[in-house]
Amino acid sequence: MAANVVIRPVGRDERAAWEPLWNGYLAFYEATLAPGASDVAWERFHDSGEPMFLLGAYVDGRLTGIVQYLFHRSSWTPGNYCYLQDLFVAEGVGSLTLA
């Protein structure tokens, strides 16, 4: 059975849903951040002047995956590159069968 998946920006009011996924990502990589780094990242995701972005995968309305990405200049091309920085899904979500 296919799940109802929607991809959209994670709203500023959804930090409580984002944090467990973000913390799961950091735990998977055994990463420790500088104090306040998550707060700064969260603000950047929601600042239209910043080149950092956050999308969420919502399964039946529940945030179950995140991708954090940014655009940056390159010396190889006149255009920008999109750098996928962080990608994480909740346990069990990766095994969903999508039709």
Q: Which residues fall in each region the model found?
A:
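Extreme N-terminal starter segment of soluble prokaryotic enzymes
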Residues: 4-5
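Acetyl-CoA-dependent GNAT
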Residues: 9-79, 85
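Conserved glycine-rich acetyl-CoA-binding loop
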Residues: 76-77, 90-99
